[in-house]
């Protein structure tokens, strides 16, 4: 008596109690469905709000449960769709970040998983989507990192590094490099050597030939901001091609955890 129920969105499947609040984790649909039915909903979808997922290159990052959720992706989330009905807006009462600890042995590791993405999620919760600005946020993040350093929060520092991705443009597979640090230069090499302030300057996505060992870092004022990130990229006859048959569930598609609908490398082929 006098208590309210709150549960993950699976409780939608068994019929909701009149006072039930739904935590929408399997995407946003559960929260929308609950709100339409007049129930409060907390938006905590796995693709954006699970802070135990990878936030930097999985090959070199500490082991997590999986997924791939960057600082920028977390910040991009809009918990209340702009075109939502008033009833839905009324019943979406907030956002929630989740961390499951089975891969985290200590507080330092939990700091690494939570920050800085918890800051992005907090701003997402208290700022109207129309007023959010990624460039403003990442400029302010520089001071936030200074504050975290002072109070000994061991945040992930991928903000100062370069993210290496691949995407298909007009049927052609290209390498895409990005750093979250504002106004930084990206310098890279393709032979496995560490980039310097005089290495090739990244200006736009580029095509590569054969197999390369791509190494990249962010620089400002001639100084490297973070660490060097690397990825071996392979080019062969199937690179960038779309599926012609339904793939087996276990095949890896896209560049990271199946985010693109192209098959990059079932096998590595070094010759035609």
For each predicted feature, which ranges?
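Active-site neighborhood of glycoside hydrolase catalytic domains
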Residues: 1-20, 25-33
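Acidic/polar loop patches that form or flank catalytic/metal-binding clefts of enzymes
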Residues: 2-9, 41-45, 128-134, 156, ...
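Hydrophobic faces of well-ordered beta-strands that scaffold small-molecule active sites
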Residues: 5-7, 22-24, 41-44, 93-97
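Active-site beta-loop-alpha junctions enriched in small/polar residues
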Residues: 10-12, 25-27, 46-48, 98-102
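Polar, glycine-rich mid-to-C-terminal structural blocks
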Residues: 19-21, 32-42, 46-59, 63-66
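Substrate-binding clefts and catalytic carboxylate motifs of secreted carbohydrate-active enzymes
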Residues: 55-56, 60-172, 180-184
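Short, compositionally stereotyped local motifs that mark structural "simplifiers"
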Residues: 132, 138-266
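Conserved small/polar residues in nucleotide/adenosyl-binding loops
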Residues: 267-272
């Amino acid at each position: 008596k006098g208590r309210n129920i709150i549960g993950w969105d699976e409780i939608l499947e068994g019929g909701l109690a009149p006072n039930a609040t739904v935590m929408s984790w399997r995407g946003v649909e559960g929260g929308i469905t609950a709100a339409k039915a007049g129930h409060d909903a907390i938006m905590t979808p796995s693709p954006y709000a699970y802070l135990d997922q990878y936030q930097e290159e999985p090959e070199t990052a500490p082991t997590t449960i999986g997924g791939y959720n960057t600082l920028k992706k977390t910040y991009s989330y809009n918990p209340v769709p702009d075109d939502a009905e008033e009833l839905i807006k009324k019943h979406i009462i907030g956002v929630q970040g989740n961390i499951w600890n089975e891969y985290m042995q200590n507080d330092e590791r939990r700091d690494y998983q939570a920050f800085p993405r918890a800051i992005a999620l907090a701003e997402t919760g208290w700022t109207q989507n129309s007023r959010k600005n990624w460039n403003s946020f990442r400029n302010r993040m520089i001071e936030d990192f200074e504050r975290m350093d002072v109070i000994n929060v061991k945040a992930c520092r991928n903000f100062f590094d370069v993210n290496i991705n691949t995407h298909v443009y007009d049927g052609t597979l290209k390498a895409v490099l990005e750093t979250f640090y504002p106004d930084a230069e990206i310098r890279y090499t393709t032979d496995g050597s560490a980039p310097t302030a005089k290495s090739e300057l990244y200006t736009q996505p580029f095509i590569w030939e054969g197999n390369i060992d791509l190494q990249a870092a962010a620089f400002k004022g001639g100084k490297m901001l973070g660490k060097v990130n690397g990825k071996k990229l392979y080019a062969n006859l199937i690179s960038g091609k779309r599926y012609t048959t339904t793939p087996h569930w276990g095949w890896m598609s896209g560049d990271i955890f199946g985010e693109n609908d192209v098959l990059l490398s079932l096998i590595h082929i070094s010759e035609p």
